[in-house]
């Protein structure tokens, strides 16, 4: 079943699959699990706590506490769910629990305070009660949202606060009378004081006004003298500036007159110089014309011959340049051909070297693969023969045909020497009563008969003994 809690509620789930208690806003409730709902809304608890001060004066302390689960602390919610949620928030059980904590802490606190301290220090007293009660409520996951301590009330038969109120009223009335008398006295004294101060201030202001008027008159005279002096100084400065300007003007007029005369003289001299220059230019041009005419007459033939020689020399130079360029082109072509031949030779050798390197790499890889395979083969043999290295060696020698090769070498060595050959036999043959079933084993028996002399011959030639599992050599004395 799927359960969903309201905004101010929590689901408390216990049972199968849950170690202790689980709080959720919404959850599936499976068989074997139990689910209850508790409300988080705070509740107002109103109490009239009867307490006694340090002077043994009883009084009643009306108070209203707004208390509910602490929603911002998961551990407090767990405590509340376990301890308080099974009971109704308005039940006598919860009410008595909260009232007992508040009354107990309030009585303990009031017992250490005088009535005057409680009456006058209401704010501090309220904070002390709040802190101590909250400390106890933390055990149940409860939180004080608000605490209001009302006015202290007398216990029937004890009129302390009534008398204290009357005392306060009388003190207030007497203080009011004193305040009225003091106010009247201060009013009359203040009135006379204000009249005297008014007359004094008026005389003082008149004297200060006369002094200020004299000061202002003197300052005005000073300012007039200062202004007249400044005007005279300014007039003198302007007259000096005018005289200086007139002097500068006279100097400039004299300079301008002299400059005009010099300019007229320079202009006259410049005209004469220009006239002489033009005359010389005319004469020079006439001389140049005569010279050019003579050059044209005497040098025309030489110029033609010179141009002809120059053209011939240029043609010879052009031919030689072209021949040199042709030779250079041939040399370049030959060098490029040699370079191409060298590149092709280098490429061919490079390819051969790479092919040889590739073949060597593959051969090495094959050798490594073969070695790994042989190693695995030998390791398998060794494991199969119980790590008997001697048996593995003998097997490899037999499997590799080493004994046959030794026999062949020995046969080649004694060929033509007529060696002694011993033949072992048990004397039986087909005519000696051997059955047809035993004839098939004749060849095998012949091989076994031949092994002892073969082992003996191998031992005589190499000094090696056959393995124990294949047999032993015959006794030398037999």
Curated annotation (Swiss-Prot):
It is a lipid-anchor. May be palmitoylated. GO terms for cellular component: caveola. It comes from Medicago truncatula (Barrel medic). InterPro entries: Band_7, Band_7/SPFH_dom_sf, Flotillin_fam. The keyword Kinase does not apply. This is Flotillin-like protein 1. Expressed in all plant organs. Primarily expressed in vascular tissues. No change in spatial expression in root upon inoculation. Expression limited to the nodule vascular tissue. It is found in: Cell membrane; Membrane, Caveola. A lipid is attached at residue 35 (S-palmitoyl cysteine). GO terms for biological process: nodulation. May act as a scaffolding protein within caveolar membranes, functionally participating in formation of caveolae or caveolae-like vesicles. May be involved in nodule formation. Residues 235-277 form a coiled coil. The keyword Membrane applies. Keywords: Cell membrane, Coiled coil, Lipoprotein, Membrane, Nodulation, Palmitate.
């Amino acid at each position: 079943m799927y359960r969903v809690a309201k905004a101010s509620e929590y689901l408390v789930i216990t049972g199968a699959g849950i170690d202790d208690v689980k709080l959720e806003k919404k959850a599936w409730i499976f068989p074997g699990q139990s689910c209850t709902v508790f409300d988080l809304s705070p509740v107002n608890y109103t109490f009239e706590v009867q307490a006694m001060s340090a002077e043994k004066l009883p009084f009643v302390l009306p108070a209203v506490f707004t208390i509910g689960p602490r929603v911002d602390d998961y551990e407090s919610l767990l405590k509340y769910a376990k301890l308080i949620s099974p009971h109704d928030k308005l039940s006598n059980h919860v009410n008595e629990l909260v009232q007992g904590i508040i009354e107990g802490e309030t009585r303990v606190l009031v017992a250490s305070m005088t009535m005057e301290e409680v009456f006058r220090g209401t704010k501090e007293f309220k904070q002390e009660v709040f802190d101590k009660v909250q400390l106890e409520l933390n055990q149940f996951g409860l939180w004080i949202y608000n605490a209001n301590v009302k006015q202290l009330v007398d216990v029937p038969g004890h009129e302390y606060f009534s008398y204290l109120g009357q005392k306060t009223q009388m003190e207030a009335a007497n203080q009011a009378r004193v305040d009225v008398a003091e106010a009247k006295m201060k009013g009359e004294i203040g009135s006379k004081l204000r009249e005297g101060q008014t007359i004094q201030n008026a005389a003082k202001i008149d004297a200060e006004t006369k002094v200020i008027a004299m000061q202002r008159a003197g300052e005005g005279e000073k300012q007039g003298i200062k202004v007249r002096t400044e005007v005279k100084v300014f007039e003198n400065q302007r007259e000096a500036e005018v005289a200086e300007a007139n002097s500068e003007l006279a100097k400039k007029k004299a300079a301008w007159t002299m400059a005009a005369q010099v300019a007229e003289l320079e202009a006259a001299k410049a005209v004469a110089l220009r006239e002489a220059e033009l005359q010389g230019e005319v004469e020079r041009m006439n001389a140049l014309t005569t010279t050019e005419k003579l050059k044209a007459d005497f040098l025309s033939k030489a110029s033609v011959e010179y141009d002809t020689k120059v053209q011939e020399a240029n043609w010879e130079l052009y031919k030689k340049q072209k021949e040199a360029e042709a030779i250079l082109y041939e040399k370049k072509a030959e060098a490029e051909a040699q370079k191409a031949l060298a590149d092709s030779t280098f490429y061919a050798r490079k390819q051969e070297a790479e092919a040889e390197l590739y073949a060597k790499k593959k051969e090495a890889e094959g050798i490594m693969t073969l070695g790994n395979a042989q190693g695995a083969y030998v390791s398998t043999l060794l494991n199969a023969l119980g790590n008997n290295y001697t048996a593995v060696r003998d097997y490899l020698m037999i499997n590799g045909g080493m004994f046959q090769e030794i026999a062949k070498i020995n046969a080649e060595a004694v060929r033509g020497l007529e060696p002694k050959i011993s033949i072992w036999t048990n004397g039986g043959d087909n005519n000696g009563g051997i059955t047809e079933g035993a004839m098939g084993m004749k060849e095998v028996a012949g091989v076994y008969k031949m092994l002892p002399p073969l082992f003996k011959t191998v031992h005589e030639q190499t000094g090696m003994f056959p393995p124990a599992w294949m047999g032993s050599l015959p006794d030398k004395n037999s």
